[in-house]
């Protein structure tokens, strides 16, 4: 038999063995993490993650306080609605009022709570600032918040076993001159593993934990400041 015919079989077996090995490493590393204990480090992680992983947020805020921050996204329904408005050639006064050119954004987006203002940032494909929208306390006091479930744009991308790492969302809806405008709040910062850390499962998991600890506190801090955002 030509040895070349054995190569595909060898690759498949090697792939299966690698997956089993990585799964064991994942389970071992995961068992060493106490999420409740890690949540007590929120203040430390908030500063550490901001300084080391997302320094651009401080740059965009230009010296303003950063009371809480997390990842964000534009719901598909909102993007479709805006797209319909654009395609119909209708001037959307509500969107113009806040100066945001909403579309289906697949690039990084962030929320930052600063004092009584909510800042929404979107980036372009190279991570540079694209849009910066500020919702003041009057807008927020008229807003509503509801649970939105797992981020729908990412469904199907991950295996079922990895669902625990998918961001869960809340949907904040603003009343902009009588027109509802909905945006998503993630319960964790978006994590993209560094290729050099592909075998370092401990580092991957602790980074995910830090991002979750920082992100999931955002809604609670927001609700404490704005009681009208309590979820029924």
Q: What do the predicted segments below correspond to?
A:
Residues 80, 84, 158-165, 182, ...:
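Intrinsically disordered, low-complexity coil segments
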Residues 16-111:
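Anionic N-terminal interaction surfaces
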């Amino acid at each position: 038999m030509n040895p070349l015919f054995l190569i595909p079989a060898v690759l498949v077996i090697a792939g299966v063995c690698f997956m089993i090995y990585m799964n064991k490493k994942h389970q071992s590393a995961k068992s060493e993490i106490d999420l409740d204990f890690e949540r007590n480090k929120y203040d430390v992680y908030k500063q550490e993650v901001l300084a080391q992983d997302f320094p651009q947020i401080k740059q965009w805020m230009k010296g303003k306080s950063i009371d809480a921050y997390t990842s964000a996204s534009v719901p598909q329904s909102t993007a479709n609605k805006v797209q319909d408005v654009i395609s119909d050639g209708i001037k959307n006064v509500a969107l113009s009022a806040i100066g945001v050119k909403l579309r289906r954004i697949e690039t990084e987006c962030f929320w930052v709570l600063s004092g009584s203002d909510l800042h929404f940032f979107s980036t372009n494909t190279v991570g540079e600032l694209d849009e910066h929208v500020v919702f003041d306390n009057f807008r927020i006091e008229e807003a509503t918040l509801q649970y939105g479930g797992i981020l729908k744009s990412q469904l199907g991308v991950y295996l079922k076993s990895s669902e625990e790492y998918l961001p869960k969302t809340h949907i904040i809806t603003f009343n902009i001159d009588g027109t509802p405008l909905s945006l998503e709040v993630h319960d964790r910062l978006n994590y993209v593993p560094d290729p050099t850390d592909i075998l370092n499962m401990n580092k991957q998991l602790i980074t995910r934990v830090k991002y979750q600890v920082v992100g999931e506190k955002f809604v609670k801090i927001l609700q404490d400041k704005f009681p009208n955002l309590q979820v029924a």
